[in-house]
Amino acid sequence: GWDKTKKYSDDKQVDNIEDLFFEFIRVAKDVQAKVIIGENVAGITMGTAREYFNRIVNGFGDIGYEAVGKVLNAADYGTPQARQRCFFVAIRNDVMDDVGINFMNMDSIIYPEPHNKQPTLRQAIEDIENDPEEEQMLLDFVQGSFQKKWIELLPFSPPKHRKPSDPEFIEINPKQSMFNMIRPAPDLPCPTLTQAGQKKGLSGVFHYNSNRKLTIKELKRVMGLPDDFKLQGDFDQQAERVGRMVAPLMMK
């Protein structure tokens, strides 16, 4: 588990950090689990947010745990998505002693080695048979929205991920806006999915060969979910829920 992560996504601390983390520590202290795993955005390890990272480690120490945190990329563990997240692992001190783990070797024992090859977006979604009505709904939405102007700048099937804020579009887009609207490269892992997978958002990942956002089936594949995984709500609610998930294959 963990608390909300948005305020550290861009390596900047906003809001009051006296938040759900301390409730998480309180519950951990009461439950006294042998091992606790927490997940947060990679930005928590950088810049001003690093102080919060250290407070997390020290907070676990105060309740009798040794904790480490490390940024992992879901693409290194079988997920067709470059999704970096910081995983904290806290082990109760008596358990550390029983199994012969100490702080010096904790990192190397706990975190798995990356796989040799990262799966690509094309490999993940090219065989999907989408609902034609859902595809058309997404295409129609772009044609009738502000997205159309920007996504049509970006070539299909690019060799690298493309954005309207790329330098070559500086004359058209001098403010370098729409920096989170992405035409992904099909032969690389997909960029990080966020709640911006909603059809209404100006940011988020579009299809590599079509002027639309990814369908729910495609989003599930990119997150590493089974095809028969059930999501509730309308399109935007389902897309948002996928974007907020921890990649299952990474956790496995």
Region locations from a protein language model:
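Class I S-adenosyl-L-methionine
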Residues: 1-182
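C-terminal target-recognition/interaction regions appended to catalytic cores
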Residues: 140-252
